[in-house]
Amino acid sequence: MKDDRVMSWPLFALAIAAFAIGTAEFIIMGLLPQVSADLGVSIPSAGYLVSGYALGVVVGGPLLAMLVGKMEEKRALLILMAIFTVGNIACMIAPGFNSLIVARVFTAFSHASFIGMAAVLASRIAPPGKEGRAMTLMFTGMTLANVLGVPVGSLVGQVYGWRTTFLGVVALGIISLLMVWYLVPAKASASKKNTQTNLQGMKRPIIWLGLMTSVMASASMFAFFTYIVPILQDVTHVEPKFASVALLVCGLGITVGGLLGGRLADWSLTRSLVLTLMALIAALVSFYWTSHFVYPAVINMAVWGCLSFCVGMLLQALIIRVAGESANYASTLNVGAFNLGNAIGAWVGGRVIDAGMPLNSITLVAATISLVTLVMVLGMFLSRDRSLLSYPSATA
């Protein structure tokens, strides 16, 4: 009897690895006050740890994709996870702020290639007709990083110091390395086309418009998310330990959004993106007022997290759907696009703070960026290439 279950041991291993990578990426948002105080830099300057990681993803993704692209996928994933683990060891022992930034950038080099390759691999090892749900389950590891990894890591950093948090991330990297080694089959994917054939599909304008849209969506998210703890402490006036609870609630919303995004993509990609972006803009604008009240602010954060990650999943599904045989490359570039937006958003948020504006005004800036994202999405759906959006999920 044929096994039609979406979850499998190889997919579970990929999800755990995604959890480790997501924790490493997002954990710094909950540690900015501790890192700032320990290394003697301002919070806006500490925000460069977010930007530096994101730029490392943008630069390292294409470079490592070329280096490991011809390898058997399991071997490539193991090499990428080893780079990730070594980088987090360097973060843990970094003697100063500059060396910590360098270590974060090095760690980030493996991020885009691993997640991009894992997203496509997840769809390939899934039963026919369930590729989209398999990809969503793999990305659930990233979203769970916000539910468990970021709040727990933030709390550990407050109690035992931020270096102890990075020790935990190193342990996650080692566990992920072992799980990929033992659980992912050596030949889990279909035979690859040659590089030239794969890159031919990247010439379609709709793919690049989709990548630019991912940049803007991510910039909106991280303009707010990077400084969410300082906002909670200085505007909402919560205790530092309660900030971890607020991050946990926000993480639950993010997890729901990640799962919801996969379902909505199967329902109607076009309608879902437009409606979700409209709701996201409303959530960001409302936070400008709810940020002054603890419980409304936390609820608003959870709604925002749900909508933000829902948009991210819809855009990832869009890129894989339209890329066809170029799915590996396009998926890797989309992870890079997301992190380029991460860097831009963190920088924009920092400039808002440096300009002396109220911290919660960052949400209005993020809402404006989301509005631009919505316009770009509408432009994509009106393009001559829009017929590609009706294709089923790729199993390239």
What are these regions (language model features)?
Residues G40, E72, I93-S99, S110, ...:
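Helix-breaking motifs and short loop linkers at transmembrane-helix boundaries and internal kinks
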Residues V59-N98:
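Conserved MFS/SLC helix-loop-helix module at the cytosolic interface between two early adjacent transmembrane helices
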Residues G61-E73, G257-L269, I353-D354:
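Helix-to-loop junctions at the C-terminal end of transmembrane segments
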Residues I83, G87-A90, N98-T107, Y295-V303:
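Paired small-residue
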Residues S99, P127-V184, Y227, I231:
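Helix-loop-helix hairpin linking two adjacent transmembrane segments in secondary transporters
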Residues A103-G141:
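Cytoplasmic helix-loop-helix junction between adjacent transmembrane helices
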Residues R271-L315:
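C-terminal transmembrane helical hairpin of 12-TM major facilitator-type secondary transporters
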Residues V322-P358, A366:
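A late C-terminal transmembrane helix in Major Facilitator Superfamily
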